[in-house]
Design a protein with these regions (language model features):
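C-terminal flanking helix
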Residues: 57-64
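Short, cationic-aromatic polyanion-contact patches
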Residues: 65-83
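Short alpha-helical segments that sit at the start of domains
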Residues: 1-20, 70
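Short amphipathic alpha-helical interaction segments
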Residues: 45-55
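Short helix-capping/hinge SLiMs at alpha-helix to coil transitions
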Residues: 24-30
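A short acidic, leucine-rich amphipathic alpha-helix
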Residues: 37-39
Length: 83
């Protein structure tokens, strides 16, 4: 099964959008993401992003997501999980 099908079956549509966004960022060399910028880029509210990132930090097998900082919007550290 390819990654897109697995993501669409395992996560909500919003969570799938966020995961795809994070994977693209990781590919570009980023590992820190602010909720407000994710929200702006994906057309979501920062609260919606924060809620889903907190959920994903506990259930996402592909990415290691941790809350990193709270100053001027929550910053999340995202790393690929070891296989």
């Amino acid at each position: 099964m390819n990654d897109k099908n697995r993501i669409s079956e395992q996560y909500t549509a919003t969570q799938g959008k966020i995961i795809s966004y994070l994977v693209q960022g990781l590919t570009a060399g980023k590992q820190y993401f602010k909720s407000k910028y994710i929200a702006k880029d994906l057309g979501l509210s920062p609260k919606e992003v924060g809620t889903n990132m907190a959920i994903l930090s506990g259930i996402c097998d592909e990415l290691d997501i941790s809350r990193w900082s709270y100053s001027n919007s929550t910053t999340w550290r995202v790393l690929p999980r070891s296989a």
